[in-house]
């Protein structure tokens, strides 16, 4: 019999905890692609040459992507009754600017100091378009609330504590039964940013063979399109960049992890 001990924490905390205790974990799964890539680059990941995976979805046979998921804008549906539903970031900027009294203190997004995924999304948004900084300026003027993770944002969105959640993971909102009539989830049509969730096996894993089998199982589930068994968005078709801006699994991701760049960002 095989037992799985599953530790859940934020992406930035996960990176810190694993770096300090690499022998305490067999598999590391995270949506923060840049942090995962740096762990691999720094020698924390075991090479698994027996796993066959597309070049664009793995790095050095040590880091393996197994889902893709776009960042979304989630809205409290009732709050937008009578207002145009924003389809782009510019649309959102316009709605917020024209209705400041309604949205002051009612916008949520990631705290990039706490969230590795939030920092990844923010840096990639900033690289893609100057619209991101205009949106951040508007959100800041409306006293946006900062969060560690998508789950907390969605909780407050459902409760009406916030009315807009920016860069939230859409599957988290759509996967909850209590959101169906409460939330509207939008993939921005201007440049929806898509991340790949990835897994690695610790070089110090106590059960490396079982860890490798687990990663192989994750990949197989997604490759087979077993959505009913594994409800996260599949990896298949991740490189169709015509409709969305996919974040590539490549060394350039580590650029914004430089201490000086992070401080200035």
Which residues fall in each region the model found?
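Extracellular/periplasmic juxtamembrane helices and adjacent flexible linkers that interface
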Residues: 208-209, 217-265
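A bilobed periplasmic-binding-protein/Venus flytrap-type ligand-binding module shared by bacterial periplasmic
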Residues: 72-79, 121-123, 195-207, 226-229
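Short, polar/charged alpha-helical segment
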Residues: 1-3, 40, 73, 175, ...
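A structural signal for short loop-to-beta-strand junctions that line the ligand-binding cleft
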Residues: 23-28, 46-77, 105-106
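Early extracytoplasmic/lumenal segment of secretory-pathway proteins
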Residues: 1-38
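Ligand-binding "clamshell"
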Residues: 39-51, 58-61, 175-187
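Periplasmic-binding protein-like
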Residues: 54-58, 69, 135-140, 146, ...
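Ligand-binding pocket segment of bilobal, Venus flytrap-like solute-binding proteins
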Residues: 105-186
């Amino acid at each position: 019999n095989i037992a799985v001990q599953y530790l859940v924490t934020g992406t930035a905390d996960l990176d810190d905890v694993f770096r300090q205790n690499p022998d305490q974990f067999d598999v590391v799964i995270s949506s923060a692609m840049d942090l995962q890539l740096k762990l691999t680059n720094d020698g924390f990941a075991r090479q698994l040459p027996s796993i066959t995976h597309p070049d664009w979805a793995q790095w050095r046979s040590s880091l393996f992507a197994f889902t893709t998921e776009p960042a979304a804008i989630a809205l409290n549906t009732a709050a937008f009754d009578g207002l145009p539903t924003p389809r782009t970031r510019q649309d959102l900027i316009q709605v917020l600017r024209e209705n400041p009294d309604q949205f002051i203190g009612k916008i949520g997004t990631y705290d990039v100091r706490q969230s590795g995924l939030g920092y990844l999304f923010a840096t990639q948004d900033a690289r893609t378009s100057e619209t991101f900084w205009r949106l951040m300026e508007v959100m800041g003027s409306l006293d946006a609330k900062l969060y560690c993770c998508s789950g907390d944002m969605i909780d407050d969105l459902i409760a009406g504590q916030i009315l807009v959640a920016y860069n939230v993971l859409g599957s988290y909102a759509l996967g909850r039964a209590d959101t169906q009539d409460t939330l509207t989830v939008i993939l921005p049509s201007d440049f929806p940013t898509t991340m790949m969730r990835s897994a690695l096996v610790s070089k110090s894993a106590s059960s490396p063979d079982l860890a490798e089998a687990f990663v192989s199982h994750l990949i197989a589930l997604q490759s087979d399109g077993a959505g009913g068994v594994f409800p996260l968005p599949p990896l298949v078709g991740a490189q169709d960049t015509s409709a969305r801006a996919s974040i590539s699994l490549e060394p350039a991701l580590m650029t914004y992890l430089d201490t000086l760049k992070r401080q200035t960002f």
